[in-house]
């Protein structure tokens, strides 16, 4: 026998329609707020923990080595923009270079000044080596200034298995000054010198003649050299305005320049440098860090040449943030 459904178990059609409408409205709202209310990250006074990506500032013009560079032209602006983005967001290496500069610029800047080389050329050294005095390229270039063996010898450096003065900060810098002067005599301006340092003077001269270009920035070059000139300028821009690009350091964050305790003049062979180091109150590792041009555990000197070996001040090697000062005030807050 058929029976009709009870009114208590059946809802009118309009009630079902209302329930469906409310579910369609409320469920997305609930899901959308699952992570909390949409309020500004700093509304409660705490700093935002989310990364913030902003486009780095690109100046309209720069002065590099006393030569004005106009960056308002779109292609030059974009090339500079690329390198500033790379340095800004490749921040690990940029931060390390800023820290290391406090150790090496006190040695390098006075030499550039004495040799008559514009101070801005130190940034060429920064991008060549990231301020690691023993760094070696796959092609065999070595040291802060990345000399190839033949070029190093041509500029007066001793380069062999026992001694590699490309890693001697002072001697390599003076050799770099000689080489930069030679390039400037050939090129006539410092931006072309930078391009020639990377690609070789013959190649740049040939392209300048073929392309009938008066400015190295207007040359059609391989990407590495084309970027190289802007990397040097971008490095200068960030080193002179670090906070503008998000680098906030205190003086205690910088790596200090540690003057040697003494300098020992050597004119004979030293068969055992580890013993020599111990006799002078330091470890062999500390001796090599102070004299990275020494390549082995002995110093061979059959010709009686004069070498000056720096003896590190082991007491000064202890980290003391109160003793670290910034070589350039613009690096720190």
Regions found by a protein language model. Give the residues of each.
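An acidic, Gly/Ser/Thr/Pro-rich helix-cap/linker signature
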Residues: 2-3, 9-116
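Catalytic glycan-binding domains that act on GlcNAc-containing polysaccharides
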Residues: 71-255, 294-300
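Generic alpha-helical secondary-structure signal
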Residues: 175, 196, 279, 287-290
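Non-catalytic surface loops within mature trypsin-like serine protease
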Residues: 236, 268, 313-315
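Hydrophobic alpha-helix feature that most strongly marks membrane-spanning transmembrane helices
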Residues: 237, 278-281, 285, 292-295
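Short conserved micro-motifs at the rims of enzyme active sites and ligand-binding pockets
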Residues: 243-244, 276, 320-324
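Primarily a LysM-type cell-wall glycan-binding module
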Residues: 252-284, 305, 332-333
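Extracellular LysM carbohydrate-binding repeats and other cell-envelope/extracellular binding modules
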Residues: 286-330
